[in-house]
Design a protein with these regions (language model features):
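Catalytic and substrate-binding clefts that recognize carbohydrates or anionic sugar/phosphate headgroups
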Residues: 1-142, 146-153, 159, 163-268, ...
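Active-site mouth loops of central-metabolism enzymes
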Residues: 274-284
């Protein structure tokens, strides 16, 4: 490692990363490392968790392709999973000049929100029962888009900015969270991922919350106080492992990451030109006949 120095505090085990001048650009939060034995489907594993100190003026970017609209991820809660329309990548870049790859392949919670709010489903629906054509595993079908309303209350101990996290349990068509009459999360389309997070400024005391989601979703809502800490947690893993990349520029950090992960090869020239994209081919005959039509048209 040419452009960084790694220091380990023996009493606490805390690891810090500095540049050649000795300036710290990243450090673990002392005592935050966790590796707890667990099982998944009867197989032994570990819950791995690590927190890092995050200065008040730090900006964090990355983690993949999400619909939540966040640019700066400092303090935001995200669940890193792969679903249709969402691509998770446990790599982030900091304006402090470093990149961090949380080297886990399974589900990972970024800045997990562990304070859950009791939600009560209301008897009435939101009154928008309708059928829409949706892509399913059996092809395009008309599926009910009926939505349900949930209500609840929660209390926060002090004024400040809080991370609000919604988990629907499955993909949905509506992510709508209102706190004290103010929309905090508001997304609607036919391809919403199961989770969404937002930051909200709240006063100390009790707050009323409403959640609107697809009727067959099972929503869970949680919160956490935003602080100057960044946390990764993986519930089913074999070890705690992460990699750090250092500048001096964003380009050099990404270049180091690409050197490690491997460069994507260019496609051959014959693969460029007309690209056919569709939902699916329903049978072998459907696919073969489509190719025949392409050849007839010299595509």
């Amino acid at each position: 490692v040419k452009n960084m120095i790694i220091r380990v505090d023996k009493p606490s085990g805390k690891v810090s990363f500095t540049d050649q001048s000795g300036k710290v650009f990243l450090s673990e939060k002392a005592g935050s490392r966790k590796l707890v034995p667990d099982t998944v489907m009867g197989e032994p594993c570990f819950m791995a968790e690590q927190s890092f100190n995050s200065p008040a003026d730090e900006y964090l970017f990355g983690l993949g392709q999400f619909q939540d609209g966040h640019y700066n991820l400092k303090g935001v809660t995200r669940q890193l999973i792969q679903v249709n329309s969402q691509i998770s990548l446990p790599f982030m870049y900091s304006n402090k000049g470093y990149g961090l790859l949380w080297h886990q392949y399974g589900l990972t919670d970024f800045n997990p929100a562990d304070n859950f709010i009791d939600l009560e489903k209301q008897e009435q629906t939101t009154g928008n029962d309708q059928m829409k054509e949706v892509t399913t595993t059996s092809g395009t079908q008309k599926v009910s888009q009926n939505q349900s309303l949930y209500t609840g209350k929660f209390t926060v101990p002090e004024d400040g900015e809080y991370s609000i996290f919604l988990d629907l349990g499955d993909m949905g068509n509506r992510q709508y969270v209102v706190i004290d009459g103010k929309p905090i999360i508001d997304q609607e389309n036919l391809w919403l991922p199961p989770t969404a997070g937002a930051l909200a400024q709240l006063e100390a005391g009790e707050h009323e919350v409403q959640v609107v989601c697809k009727a067959d979703n099972n929503p869970k809502l949680s919160w956490n106080r935003k602080d100057n800490v960044t946390t990764f947690r993986s519930p089913h893993t074999q070890q705690l492992d992460y990699l750090v990349f250092h500048g001096p520029s964003a380009d050099s950090v990404i270049a180091s990451y690409r050197d490690l992960s491997g460069n994507a090869p260019m496609l051959p020239r014959w693969a460029y030109g007309f690209w056919q994209c569709r939902e699916r081919y329903t049978s072998g005959d459907h696919l073969v006949n489509t190719v025949k039509k392409f050849r007839e048209r010299n595509l």
